[in-house]
Amino acid sequence: MEASPRSLTSCTLGPLDQKFSWEQLSELEAYFKVEPYPDLQDRKIMATRLKLKEEQVEAWFIQRSLEEEMRPPLARLQQSALDGTSSPSHKALCCRPPSWKYRLIPINPPESSTSCLKDSKTVLISKTELTDEQFQKLRKHFETDRCPNEETLQAFAEELKLRKDLIRSWFITQRHRMRGYRRLFMRYYRDWKTSREYSTTRSFDRQKNSKECSQNDPGLPEALEALKRLKLSSGYQSRDGMSQDF
């Protein structure tokens, strides 16, 4: 029996007031281990199967990626070792839906002194929450500096009249989206290079380039004509007794 959206067996994803049952979280978590950055089609399939909106699925994967990035390297190695050597009963225990504390994200994260800001305790902020002027200024800075320091964030907060934690969250989210887009592009590029259409296009391009090189070489027609005259003058005959013509 499915848990109701407001039952105690569901939990909230950050400040978005989105509810997920334990069954939904289990499927999302299992898929995340296989593909942390699903494309739009995969997200729609998951949303249909889990009776969620595609935007909810996308938001969950973004925040789950932030959480995974902030895990210490040692913890990741220990988890990998457990996945490979644990008993079936222990693996089943570890595969239970994650605790609420990993799904709940406070609104006011602590300050960070690192130059490249990576904080899992962040607040999602979308383009719709920014004015056009605010969004354009942030995007322009992101093109040259994707990891602004604290001084830059404070300057943006004063200039744009926004909370610094919101600006920090915007940069973190953009970095994760860029990483996801790069993975999607590389996967598409690999599929394209192994496709029959790519092979046909490459063959056509080689033939076209060869023909253009022949047409663009001013000495080639004269050389062929001279070779023809030389063979005719030397009495070169083809197999049928006629002069070989080019």
From Swiss-Prot:
Gene3D superfamilies recorded: Homeodomain-like
Portion annotated as DNA-binding: 22-72, 129-182
GO cellular component terms, A-Z: nucleus
Keyword Transcription regulation (UniProt): yes
Pfam families linked to this entry: Homeodomain
Keywords, alphabetical: Developmental protein, DNA-binding, Homeobox, Nucleus, Repeat, Transcription, Transcription regulation
Protein name: Homeobox protein Crxos
Organism from which the protein derives: Mus musculus
Gene name of the record: Crxos
